[in-house]
């Protein structure tokens, strides 16, 4: 064994061994308990970043630990390979998205291997290959036949620069998340999948997810947004149709003083024919964002349409306004306004001088003061005719019943959740498998024409999708009739909604899933990824699983038993202000810093001499230029060091602050482990351990070894507090470093301890542990070694600490055998100088003894 720890030598050697032996390839095995450990698949952007490394290290630690428990562990990886960045990169680099993507995959695959992740590479998949997306296309056509897919015109967030539709979440401050262009609203025909048909099940089944973070479940509950209320119909004077609104607060209905409709509502359009001000307002609304977060903060504006609706219970005429906070896509495109008891309605009414009528008493029973704001709390009704004096629940039911009896109301359950718009006007995505025949009939692409293959040899102009620009691509024939293919492609959330299931049978050619394999591995036992995916990906992931279940492919209701959301990786961020007044962000690698005695940064400059402003720790990002390249760190310290730091620096679900000093500390620790094994093995063979022949000191050390095994097992397995597991191993290592190594049993005990340490560290630092296991002559490869088991007998304490009090005041702490009697403890206590001093010449009137813990002598 060489004396120095040289990770660059051992890591490549061990990785080659894993590759040649196919160590992590698995097949279904009914004789073993399965464990499916999955990290969210990466987008092949070109290089791994530290967020990836953290995510995949956590997954690999769990997978390797479960493997050592003897389970049949599946840990696959693949590539979420479609998407917009590839198009931008292709234009920039004068290539096509496909070669750019495949080059990135090859590069990042090597980076993953360099980090020593134990993946089953035989199951690797890339979502941009026809072998993958053909099954998604087939499934979509089946959903269409089931009535779960439809096409409709819909107002969307349109990025004029990228020429694509953006999801609400992709609109940041009214601009495109990717290119910062101002977003417009546009009506275009799009394909939708009816996720709303599963709204109740998606909501109710959250209760089954005991091992998902409550934050994620709450976000999904709010996103689905189930509410119970009443749909109310209003007659409108001089208008051919009625207006329908939905409210969750029918108890406030007597305070409804105006209605508001969306700018795109037919009533507003009709009114605009003779109203130039309204027509201009409608035009302005076309460029309003449709993201709810934006709508909540934007200025509320409106124009009176001139129409009057009739309040069904009071007969009063109330104005109908067109307002920018009402959307056609949400509900009926019309809302009732109760400005006395809704803050948004109150602000709008105050701005435009509309009537504000209070109908709910304040908590103290007085009339509410509405001079500054609305009273939004529930309470007792007044000013409401026959409903006066009713509380919220009674009023809700009484008004709902009356409206129903009159034929102008109906109780309804509503959802905030909208159907999933899956059309994208981009090139680099899976083609949507629908065709339009010459006679206008729209139908699914026949099975014998699937997959609809995306041509990869294309020229990108950065504006129009090549399959839209080429009129020949869309032409096809169905049933002998000319037809045109759909030129939109799928939202890339489609591919990432079912990849986890395809990993169970990636080579299966008969269909989307091999049910036998899928049902062996599914559900996923632990799914690891960022909390930013809580409502988009993780909701579609659950939805797709239920669709596949209802298609008879899987048996389970939910795709993953446990969800672990890892924290972000933060790093120092620095900038200087350039001559143009803009911030120039400087990489922390290039910052020369001065620190105070507490280690805080007080001054910084770069190599060019710029004084730098230190903004603290923030998420590693390109925009702040504070990303640290994992490859550089691996080349400098080795993969094991990077992995160990990642798992030690912070609990897995908390933010991790990147500190190179911490990385150096992790490296020093691994050098100490190496040195101890080197010194131990240099002394030659070891005798067998005789636990009956150990001295008290040896027993104490062995007790520490087995207590550490018990703690680390609990920390990794049950608590998933990996940082405390590592801390416990480090503490044990400090004790082992000081332990005597001269005697035969000293060395036998050290052998047992080191074999345990190396196995406990193996999930975190597999390369060094693989090597040290061989040097310690462990049986076989460590990859097949069992997890160490704590010896209960070894952990039993021979002695215990008893606190001795005289008249309730602590006078001594004594160590006694665990089986000592009360008399023996009293005798031992009497030998203590301080105790004897207080007993001299007095009578012990009472003795309180708590076995093994406390002796209190009451004297007088």
Curated annotation (Swiss-Prot):
Q: Where is this motif: 'KMSKS' region?
A: 619-623
Q: List, alphabetically, the SUPFAM superfamilies matched.
A: Anticodon-binding domain of a subclass of class I aminoacyl-tRNA synthetases (SSF47323), Nucleotidylyl transferase (SSF52374), ValRS/IleRS/LeuRS editing domain (SSF50677)
At the top of the EC hierarchy, this enzyme's class is ligase
Query: Which biological process terms from the Gene Ontology are attached to this UniProt entry?
Result: leucyl-tRNA aminoacylation
The EC designation for this entry is: 6.1.1.4
Listed GO MF terms: aminoacyl-tRNA deacylase activity; ATP binding; leucine-tRNA ligase activity
**Reactions this protein catalyses:** tRNA(Leu) + L-leucine + ATP = L-leucyl-tRNA(Leu) + AMP + diphosphate
Localization annotation: Cytoplasm
Q: What is this protein called?
A: Leucine--tRNA ligase
Q: The organism's lineage?
A: Bacteria, Pseudomonadati, Pseudomonadota, Gammaproteobacteria, Enterobacterales
Q: Which gene encodes it?
A: leuS
